[in-house]
Amino acid sequence: MLQTLQAFPNSKVLSKWLEVRGKRLENTSGTEASILNNPLTPNHSSLTTKSDEKPFPIEGEGLGRGSSFHLGMAGYTFNKFDIDTTLAFMRRIDVHYLCIKDFHLPLDADADQVAAFKAKLAEHNVVGYAVGPIYMKDVPAAEKAFAYAQRVGVDLVVGVPGSWGDKSPNYAVLDRVEQLVRETNIRYAIHLHGPDMSLYPDATSIWEDVKDRDPRLGICLDIGHDLRYGSDPMRDLKRYAKRVFDIHLKDVTAPTKEGKAIELGRGIIDFPLFVKLLRKVGYKGSVSLEYEKDMSDPFIGIAESVGYFKAVMQTAQ
């Protein structure tokens, strides 16, 4: 606990974090509570146990003063867990927006599978607000991704026009994506990956490729990766606000490739300033935690990060 307390230099944020954490534990019983208290708990199977409690209302997230955006989860966070575990844990931490990954709902899912998946989300009071990130190695892959988004019923695809190892964007794919955006009225946000990937390492590299295209092509601003590349995510949010359609929350230990993912509030990103800026630019999308530390046992870090960010949202003036 001492290490956690030292991560909060702002006493107002600390007190609000403790309040939020306390309320979550009051509503958490048995093994779920032990998981939140003990990061070494090896068995997460109880998270899939159906609870008798009613889902938390989406409107009751306590997002703070003047917020027009939603706190969500990037599905990649749960890449080692099934959708039942994911949704049960999201209920426990009172987060209700999910960017859907294809390991939870396959790209070739048919109408019946999509309907069953959406019913499961609704049971847990979770909204699937987007799909992705989806890598699009060629035009057929782009067409498949947009058909998938239509079946799921979302208005945003987070993607990359190319493959992980590509050195430059696939402009044939991007051209087709622009056509698909016009045909479907589904927006497209290119995800940046910092210094780990040649394609679109920061927000500016995306901006250069979308600025003269349909305004429904934009940016998924991963603030941790943007910073690790040496860019300034605060500056980029201000510069490109009208084209930022999705945001992935991360904190990191250094503004370099060697920077590692860490719980929100323990790294070098100024989250009170970030929240103030989100409000100033009028951002209206989702702000989704993509937690990439301890991905085989992430629950305590996710809970801490969500509690911290909610506290910042309630205290940032």
Predicted regions and their residues:
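Arg/Gly-rich low-complexity intrinsically disordered repeat tracts
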Residues: L14-G30, S34-L47, E53-P55
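A structural motif corresponding to the C-terminal end of an alpha-helix
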Residues: H124, L180-N185, R213, F274-K284, ...
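Active-site groove signature of glycoside hydrolases
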Residues: A149-S168, T184-P195, S288-L289
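Hydrophobic faces of well-ordered beta-strands that scaffold small-molecule active sites
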Residues: F69-G75, L98-I100, G128-P133, V157-G159, ...
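Active-site beta-loop-alpha junctions enriched in small/polar residues
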Residues: A74-F78, K101-L105, P133-M136, P161-W164, ...
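Distinct, well-ordered alpha-helical segments
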Residues: I83-L87, A111-V114, P140-F146, P169-D175, ...
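Acidic/histidine-rich catalytic cores of soluble enzymes
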Residues: R182-P272
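N-terminal pre-domain/capping segments
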Residues: M1-W17, G22, T49-D52, E59, ...
